[in-house]
């Protein structure tokens, strides 16, 4: 069923309360994005941003199809939007695309330990490179998720082995220079 879009006169009303109410029926992502950045009233801007995020996350009955939302996310790499979708998007596919755009180590750790979907937990884990972070993930997932725990331990052990190997090579080079 087609949802009723608000009349443009409601969206252009000088009354912020009327514009705010009209946003609840608006599903045009471009228009919401424009209102979120340009409306004179901060409450209307915040409501437009909230509606935009809700639609992109797939939490509204009138959300666009997943393919459209995936494309929009790939085009709009706003860190706040990416973070919102990573935590609130309905479909794991959308959260996975958001994860690909995330660089914050703390967010990657949180997803690796707490996300309800195994694929996202493992994908987040693979993006973590710091030994301390891998150790934290291993400790926090030890009794909850054996696959994540094992993979974190494997990666941590590999990093430690590489560090030992590099230090051994450096020591050998120093010894050879001293001959």
Language model features with spans:
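Alpha-helical scaffold segments
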Residues: 1-179
């Amino acid at each position: 069923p087609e949802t009723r879009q608000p009349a443009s006169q409601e969206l252009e009303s000088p009354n912020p309360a009327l514009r705010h109410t009209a946003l609840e029926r608006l599903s045009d992502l471009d228009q919401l994005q424009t209102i979120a950045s340009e409306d004179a009233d901060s409450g209307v801007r915040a409501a437009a941003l909230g509606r935009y995020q809700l639609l992109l996350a797939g939490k509204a009955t009138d959300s666009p199809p997943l393919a459209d939302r995936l494309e929009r996310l790939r085009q709009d790499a706003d860190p706040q939007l990416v973070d919102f979708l990573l935590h609130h998007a309905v479909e794991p596919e959308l959260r996975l695309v958001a994860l690909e755009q995330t660089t914050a180590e703390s967010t990657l750790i949180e997803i690796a330990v707490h996300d309800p979907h195994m694929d996202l937990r493992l994908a987040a884990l693979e993006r973590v490179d710091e030994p301390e972070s891998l150790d934290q993930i291993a400790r926090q997932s030890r009794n909850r998720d054996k696959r994540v725990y094992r993979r974190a331990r494997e990666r941590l052990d590999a990093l430690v082995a590489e560090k030992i190997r590099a230090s051994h090579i450096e020591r050998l080079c120093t010894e050879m220079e001293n001959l």
